[in-house]
Amino acid sequence: MKLFVWRRVGLGALTIVLTTFLVHLALYAAPGDPIGYLLNGQPATPERVAALREQFHLDDPFFVRYFSWVSDLLTGDLGISSSFNSEVSMLLATRIPTTLQLVLISIVFIFGFGLSMGIFAGLKSGGFDSFSMTIVTILSSIPAFVGSYLLINFFAVQLGWFPAIGSGDGSVLSTLWHMTLPAIALALSAGSYVARTTRASVKVESSSEHVVTATVRGIPRGKILSRHIIRNALLPIMSLGGLLLVGLMVATAFVEQAFAINGLGSLLVVAARQQDFALVQAITLIMVVSFVVVNLVVDILSWILDPRMRSDGA
């Protein structure tokens, strides 16, 4: 167990280190003086140029600049946003909770819909299976931004059941009310993917040798479903954790823009448009670290729950 965990932690740490290097290198990949890119049309006053050179350590050799930047990251100094003229850490502190709320609510929809639809479709054959997979296929083909505008037009504008913009006043009920449509828009594609994967896993487990043997021995159907079919079918779903997170983080940019939510995704869009390099750097690193942490947790849980991984010495 310890060797497995340390191996995964080491790979995750290596991924983060390589990402920091590539993100830092991106500033110097473009031709010309980085100052011209960082100014982004702002007046090139001596004070502004000097501040940028100090912030990005431009007067130091490349590796000195890199390690100075990493040192700043570790102390919480993420630089100054040129778009908002504010500390990047302060901007992130106000935006991250909103995006976390959106992602967590969408995860409830993703697994609530995906697992239930996939399990029932996997256990049933014929009409329900075909109908449910048709619905899943249609939903999976709807991009997040298209789904956002469809939901806004029907449920917010036509019916008036939900607000069209914003994230609420901070209370639990207001947050849930405002976040329901964005979370559904975010969950459409991912929930459909979970449903298809769950259905396939359930069908494979239902026809496996140990399930057939348990059925012949007269073990109650409920025990077979809970202990063998569903439990084993959920293991492949866990391995999707990292990929689902990446998809959700990317989709939040479109969904938050559509619903005018002040979250991390909409902040990334603004930063990219304004060529706010310090802000883009910070958000990119947050996404990579989140991906690494989620994958690490998923790998450990899979190792604990799946005897096959332990027997293989993974």
Residue ranges and their predicted role:
Residues 59-115:
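An internal, D/E-rich "acidic patch" concept
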Residues 15-64, 159-178:
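Hydrophobic alpha-helical transmembrane segments of membrane transport/permease proteins
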